[in-house]
Structures are given as structure tokens and as C-alpha cells.
């Protein structure tokens, strides 16, 4: 999670003096990155996944399961050359710290080759090894669970050993600071978000309505006076009918599944980034796995808005809200005291933007519509790629920018206006953690100032430039232009996580091969993000997506690539070019026949019926894709460019139009399988067995 520098992190009061220094030098570093890597070509399609685990202490005698906060030494052991690192390297796995002291992040030690079918077949095995190696070197009662959220986080005793919520960093009423990673960055990050904001984060989730449910969060302490902030839930931070959470740990203590893919060049990365933007809320809904927070069943199924609220450092004025009684409108922003009268009489223009208000370093104080952790605000524009589908009207969100940064990127960096706008939007933020030893850097060789801002903008997608290297470095051996896909929730089993990881990567590779047009206005993507939070949204709701007939692909070219292709391939009825020989009279499964997956029978099909998706980890309610719409979405005449589809339709297709699955299967049939058979010693029988 972000940069883990060795050194002394500055408190907010100290670090805010260097905010402009970090932004200015970060942009210099970014300009140098573009100079070094802007014309880079022909990088291999490499990719990797990040799985986040929770260490859970099971007491069979007392029948309890609690988050383990004293076994974090395991990460050091797994990275110690004298202990477990040689074993981890030999097993091709790598381990990293996360926000929670009870958390472990694990990745493959080397990226997968996205052009090799064998690497896709290896993913689950690698994930199994990651879990086992870590678990085998912990006490037997400590288990690694891939839970999106720990259901009882914030309840009375939920940690092992027990710890009290009285920490100075978070000042939480519910979470002890002992859940936070011991590295100095993390408690400083927690405290600095609160100090910049001027009050604690306030996360309110709707309680799931039931006849026996009290629509009141009665877990909020009424008489605690340990910190001044203890009164906040009673002066406006909490809402009736909602669960109240007040700490970064409720969000950043969640686990997710993230995928990073390297493209051949920057233009391809821009097209992939834009193409995945409308898919992000679809995959958030499909992977939903978080129906319980702080011991309450909530009226939503995912973690996203919880994490968004948990790292929301915006002040009252940046959010356009009235402050709590006795609280400052500008929170912890660095402003001149003598400006108080003018500040209290600030004006806004017709768009709601603030006029003539600045911090001491000259940065305008702006309205900021979204948290640092949210969906993307701008497409990057594919007009420099082969496709050229983008139109300006697709970027229809209010996304304020840092004008000085924008102008520098245009004038000095020679970036086009869309790329400059992307980074200028990220750089409206302040750095949250600055290490005193890292204030001065070599902008030709280091990029920590850039990453300080870049890595603390946690969006559904992250456009990842390469790092800076010396002139004699062979850049082909270093990571290139990458896209990180970030919305998915972690799943309970390695099989599920491997399936989601391989699916989104195969879909991305299929997008690059077949070049569909998925652009819709980002305002529709934002509606989809809200829809994805709803209970059973995968089963019950329709999502905005580009009309099937406008994907710019020939549907007939995908006719032979439903799930039946696998049956034909396995039974020897496939022609050399990957097409299915439909004239063969051998026994065949129909589209609606069950397919055996991982030892269990799962119904999958190529139609838009409800049997293709049964349930997510966030639901156990009745099955079926009824395609119900929600009240907040009205029919809009947009000339048929965008339509509302069930997730079944988007995944499996509808009528003559292919969905995501057929794109993936055709990629496997015409690209990965022929390459595997032609370029290796493996036989078709061995490939089928694998």
C-alpha cells in the first residue's frame, strides 16, 4: 500500500509546509518520466495480482474468531534472507505489508506472461502456495482468510490479544490503534487525514431493514471524553438509521483483489484504461462480498464507499458542507489567520467553485466532488491509439484540476491536454505523509514525490507510468506503462480469486485484440458505481453500458465461441483455426447444460437467461437476473448510444450480440491455445488435462 520509506514521517502541522514542494518536484519527476519513457514500445503483456489476507485467531475452546494483531512478524520473516525469503523466492511468491497489522498482501514473485496459456493455468496454484507458506509458519490456530471485511471489526472484543480503542492516531470510538501497521507511515497517515480534514472521518452505512432491527446504532459510546472528537457523532457525524464508523481502519482494513497489466506502449495503456472504466462497477457488483460491517447487516453488499469515506481528507469547505458546531470550515488547511474575516464571507461562482481563496503556498482552495478513493473522473482519450473512439462529451464529470500543474505539463512536459488534465486532477490533493529524510530528491533518478500523490489517489483504475532509471539501464527489463484494475472484492477461496484474476486479464487482452468500443459518459459510470452498492445488484438491477450494436465488432465472428467451444475442443471437434466444427455428430453439451468447474456443477450459458449467475459472496437471496431498474435512474433519450443491461447480458451476451465471455473464449481459442500447441512440447491431451 503506497510508499514505505525508511525515515521520520512528519506530522500534518510540519508536513503541510512542504505540500507545494512535493507537488512541484513530483511534476518535475513526472515530466522526466515522460521524457525517458514516452516513446517506449513493444513491451510484453505482463500482469500480476495482489491478494490481501486477514490473520484470524481461532479459539476452538471459547468458540471465538478474532483478528490477530501480534503475528505481524510473519511479514518480516517471509522477507528475511536468513529465514523464509529463499523459500518464498523458490516458490515464486512475495509478501508485503498492508494497512492493518492483521493483514498480509501476497503477489507472485515475478509477473505472469499474459501471452502464455500456461501462466493462466498456474494462477490458482500460486495463490494456494502463498496462503500455505504463510500459514505453515504461523501457530496452528492462526488462519489466513480472504475476507473483504471482518464482520465484527469495531465490536467489543474483536482483536487477539484484546486491545482498547483509545489510540491517539485514530481517536476512534471503536478501533484501537493496535490494529494499524507498526510502520511509522500508517499511524501518521491515519492522523494526518484526520488533522487535514479538521475532524474524524465519518462513514454512515444504511442498516438493513428488518422487523426485528433497531434502526439505531446503539454501539456509539455516549459519555466518553477522552478526545475532543468524541462528541462528533452527537453533533452531526452520525445519522439515524445508519451504522456509524469513525476510523480509517474500517476502510483500509478491508481486503480486495487488484490486477495490474503492462501494455506495449502508452497509447495502448490509455485505450485499455478507458475501456475498463465502464467495466469497473460491473466487476464490483459481480464480486460483491461485504454485507456486514461492525456487527450489523447493512443495506448494501460492497466495501467501496466505506473505504472512500475512510480516507476522505476533504475539509467541510471542500465538500460544500456546513461544519459541526464549533468546528472550522477549513479544517487543518494552511491559511493565514488574518484572512479569517474574508474566509467567513467567502464567495462562490455559478459552478459552486470558491473564489480567491488560497492556502499559504498559493494553492487554490477548491470544491472537491469526490474522495481520494473513488471512481475515475476522466478518460485518457484513445485518439493516439488505433481505435480513436473517444469523444469529449464522454468526460462529463466535474473534475477540478490544479491549473499550475496543468500548464506546466502542457508547456514543459509537452503532454496532450487529456493526459495533462488527468495528472492535474490528481494533483489537486495534498501529500499525506512526508518523510523528513526524503524531502530533497534527485528528480532525474527518483520519483517518490510523484508517487506520494499518485499512490494516494485510490481510484477504480490507476494509470501507472514507469519509474525513472539511469541512462545505462536496459528499460526492456523494467516495468513499462501499466493499468491497475482496483474495484474487485476479495473472494473466500483461491479458486474464486484465480477465476476473477484470470477473467479480467483475459478480458483486457481480448479488448486489446478485438478493439471494442465501450465508451459511455462517465456520469453513467458513476451511476453504475452507486448501483453496484445495492443489495443483490448483480441479480436485480440493470447497468448502463454502450449498446451492443455499437461495440464496433462483428457479432457473427463470435458465434462459435460460447461455452460449448470447450466441449468441442475437449472432444476433438475443433478445427485448427480455433473454430468449432458444428457438423460433427459427437455428443455435445448445449448452451444451458451444466459445466463441471473445480469439482462442482455450475450452470453457465451463452444466453441472457438468469441461470448464468447464481449468487455473489454478498448475497444468499433468490437467484435470477430479473433486470429490475432503480428509482433514481430515469429513461433518457440518448439516441441509443447507451442502454441498460443486466450483468447476465453483459457477461453472456444477448441475442446475436456477444458478451464479455465470448470475447474471452475467442481469445483463448484463436490466440492462446494455438500458441500453446505450436510453441511448446505440450500435447493437446496434456493441455486439456491441465
From Swiss-Prot:
Pathway, per record: Sulfur metabolism; glutathione biosynthesis; glutathione from L-cysteine and L-glutamate: step 1/2
Protein encoded by which gene: GCS1
Q: Where is this region: Disordered?
A: 574-620
Q: Which GO terms describe its molecular function?
A: ATP binding; glutamate-cysteine ligase activity
For this protein, the record's Gene3D superfamilies field holds: 3.30.590.50
Q: Which organism is it from?
A: Candida albicans
Put simply, this protein is called Glutamate--cysteine ligase
| EC code(s) of this entry | 6.3.2.2
Q: Does the keyword Nucleotide-binding apply?
A: yes
**Record's keyword annotation contains Ligase:** yes
Q: Where is the composition biased (Low complexity)?
A: 574-585, 598-619
Amino acid at each position: 500500500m503506497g510508499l514505505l520509506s525508511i525515515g521520520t514521517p512528519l506530522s500534518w502541522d510540519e508536513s503541510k509546509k512542504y505540500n507545494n514542494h512535493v507537488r512541484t518536484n513530483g511534476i518535475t519527476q513526472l515530466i522526466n518520466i515522460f521524457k525517458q519513457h514516452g516513446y517506449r514500445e513493444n513491451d510484453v503483456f505482463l500482469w500480476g495480482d495482489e491478494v490481501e489476507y486477514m490473520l484470524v485467531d481461532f479459539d476452538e475452546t471459547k468458540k471465538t474468531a478474532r483478528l490477530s494483531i501480534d503475528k505481524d512478524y510473519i511479514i518480516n520473516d517471509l522477507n528475511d534472507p536468513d529465514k523464509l525469503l529463499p523459500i518464498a523466492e523458490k516458490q515464486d511468491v512475495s509478501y508485503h505489508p498492508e494497512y492493518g497489522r492483521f493483514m498480509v498482501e501476497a503477489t507472485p514473485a515475478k509477473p505472469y506472461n499474459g501471452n502464455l496459456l500456461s501462466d493462466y493455468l498456474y494462477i490458482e496454484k500460486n495463490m494456494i502456495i502463498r496462503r500455505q507458506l504463510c500459514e505453515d509458519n504461523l501457530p496452528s490456530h492462526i488462519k489466513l482468510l480472504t475476507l473483504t471485511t471482518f464482520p465484527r471489526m469495531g465490536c467489543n472484543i474483536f482483536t487477539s490479544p484484546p486491545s482498547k480503542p483509545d489510540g491517539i492516531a485514530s481517536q476512534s470510538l471503536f478501533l484501537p490503534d493496535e490494529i494499524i501497521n507498526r510502520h511509522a507511515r500508517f499511524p501518521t497517515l491515519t492522523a494526518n487525514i484526520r488533522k487535514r480534514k479538521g475532524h474524524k472521518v465519518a462513514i454512515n452505512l444504511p442498516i438493513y431493514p428488518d422487523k426485528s432491527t433497531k434502526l439505531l446504532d446503539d454501539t456509539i459510546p455516549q459519555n466518553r471524553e477522552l478526545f475532543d472528537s468524541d462528541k462528533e457523532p452527537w453533533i452531526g457525524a452520525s445519522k439515524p438509521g445508519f451504522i456509524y464508523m469513525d476510523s480509517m481502519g474500517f476502510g483500509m482494513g478491508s481486503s480486495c483483489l487488484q490486477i495490474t497489466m503492462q501494455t506495449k506502449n502508452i497509447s495502448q495503456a490509455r485505450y485499455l484504461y478507458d475501456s475498463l472504466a465502464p467495466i469497473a462497477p460491473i466487476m464490483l457488483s459481480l464480486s460483491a462480498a461485504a454485507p456486514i460491517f461492525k456487527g450489523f447487516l447493512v443495506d448494501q453488499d460492497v466495501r467501496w464507499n466505506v473505504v472512500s469515506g475512510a480516507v476522505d481528507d476533504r475539509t467541510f469547505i471542500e465538500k460544500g458542507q456546513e461544519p459541526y458546531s464549533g468546528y472550522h470550515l477549513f479544517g487543518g488547511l494552511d491559511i493565514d489567520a488574518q484572512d479569517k474575516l474574508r474566509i467567513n464571507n467567502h464567495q462562490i461562482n455559478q459552478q459552486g467553485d470558491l473564489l480567491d481563496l488560497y492556502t499559504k503556498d498559493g494553492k487554490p482552495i477548491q470544491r472537491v466532488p469526490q474522495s481520494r478513493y473513488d471512481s475515475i473522473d476522466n478518460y485518457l482519450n484513445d485518439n493516439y491509439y488505433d481505435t480513436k473512439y473517444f469523444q469529449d462529451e464522454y468526460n462529463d464529470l466535474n473534475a477540478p484540476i490544479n491549473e499550475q500543474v496543468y500548464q506546466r505539463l502542457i508547456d514543459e512536459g509537452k503532454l496532450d491536454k487529456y493526459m495533462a488534465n488527468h495528472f492535474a486532477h490528481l494533483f489537486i490533493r495534498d501529500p499525506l505523509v512526508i518523510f523528513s529524510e526524503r524531502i530533497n530528491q534527485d528528480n532525474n533518478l527518483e520519483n517518490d514525490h510523484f508517487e506520494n500523490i499518485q499512490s494516494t489517489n485510490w481510484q477504480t483504475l490507476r494509470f501507472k507510468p514507469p519509474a525513472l532509471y539511469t541512462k545505462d539501464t536496459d528499460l526492456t527489463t523494467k516495468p513499462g506503462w501499466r493499468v491497475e484494475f482496483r474495484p474487485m472484492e476479495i473472494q473466500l477461496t483461491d479458486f474464486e480469486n484465480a477465476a476473477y484474476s484470470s477473467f479480467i486479464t483475459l478480458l483486457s487482452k481480448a479488448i486489446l485484440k478485438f478493439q471494442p468500443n465501450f465508451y459511455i459518459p462517465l456520469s453513467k459510470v458513476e451511476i453504475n458505481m452507486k448501483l453496484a452498492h445495492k443489495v443483490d445488484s448483480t441479480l436485480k438491477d440493470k447497468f448502463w453500458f454502450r449498446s451492443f450494436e455499437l461495440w464496433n465488432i462483428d457479432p457473427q465472428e463470435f458465434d462459435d465461441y460460447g461455452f460449448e467451444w470447450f466441449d468441442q475442443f475437449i472432444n476433438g471437434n475443433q478445427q485448427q483455426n480455433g473454430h468449432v466444427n458444428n457438423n460433427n455428430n459427437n455428443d455435445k453439451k448445449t448452451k444451458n447444460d451444466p459445466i463441471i468447474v473445480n469439482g462442482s456443477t455450475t450452470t453457465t450459458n451463452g444466453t441472457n437467461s438468469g441461470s448464468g449467475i447464481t449468487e455473489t459472496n454478498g448475497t444468499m437471496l433468490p437467484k435470477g437476473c430479473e433486470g429490475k431498474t432503480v428509482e433514481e435512474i430515469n429513461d433518457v433519450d440518448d439516441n441509443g448510444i447507451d442502454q441498460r443491461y443486466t450483468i447476465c447480458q453483459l457477461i453472456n451476451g444477448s441475442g446475436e450480440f456477444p458478451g464479455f465471455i465470448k470475447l474471452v473464449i475467442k481469445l483463448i481459442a484463436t490466440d492462446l491455445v494455438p500458441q500453446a500447441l505450436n510453441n511448446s512440447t505440450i500435447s493437446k491431451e496434456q493441455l486439456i488435462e491441465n
